């Protein structure tokens, strides 16, 4: 059984009120008394009851972040950004991993564990637009991502279509004409893959280049292995291309590996760009050109909006914010000499 405040008071030989004063860092506690209480807390491995604390103050000082998969680098780096943004406001972050499973995504909004936090930052992957009416919980919610629009919750998202268009235009500006896509999802319209493919198509249309589905590789997941398998498929089919747009960085990394193994020079023979600006893309060989979708801004905006909603739950109608983006040219498109100096479009 977990230790209680009364247990701590008994072991320390002080009153319940004194233990409470120590835990809440009240100034008027003698050093010797504080030391006795802290020793008792350590001996009993006492953990504060966030639910009880919330009943007293109305707030727990914690927020929940629900993500599909921390094994995907983008979500791991997003979690880090949210934790950093929350810490600036004295908040702790509780992590829920849904596994991109519809049942678990629904459960996270109804979980008793939400009573341990003041709000939920939620990035669904299995739920879709048809589930917009199901986005509700007993605490304020801020949605992330591109699966659901128009719910009753605040929403922070990236500019997928303009950013993908800018990434494709970067390749076109370098003289590339046959740009393969790695990472499309069959039949998807709303969602990161569908929106980024739309941006790619818009860039081609703007330059009068016909869309060719024969150089679009469809996948189920967005891991390096999927990017590698998709590139193997393109090469095995004899597809002709001089550039690749990986719809995320891990897909692009898998594609680059297969291209190099097949004897292609990157970017000499095939230029490659990804999307997400993962930290590791600065250290790949070659370094990977990519799109920075504004991950830190997403995290900071989500925390700010959640705090505003916690303070005034019905203060304003649901808000939707799109973060800025920028194309980051590196060696995989412009070569080592030009990397870092090439102009980059920015979404405002």
Tell what function each PLM region has.
Residues 116-124, 180-183, 217, 238-248, ...:
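Periplasmic-binding protein-like
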Residues 68-77, 95-104, 156-166, 182-230, ...:
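Hinge/beta->alpha junction and helix N-cap segments in small-molecule ligand-binding domains
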Residues 232, 236-243, 248-348:
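Flexible loop/turn connectors
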Residues 35, 46-111, 115-119, 186, ...:
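Amphipathic helical "hinge" segments at domain boundaries
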Residues 123-166, 186, 209-210, 250, ...:
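Flexible loop/hinge segments that line or gate small-molecule binding clefts
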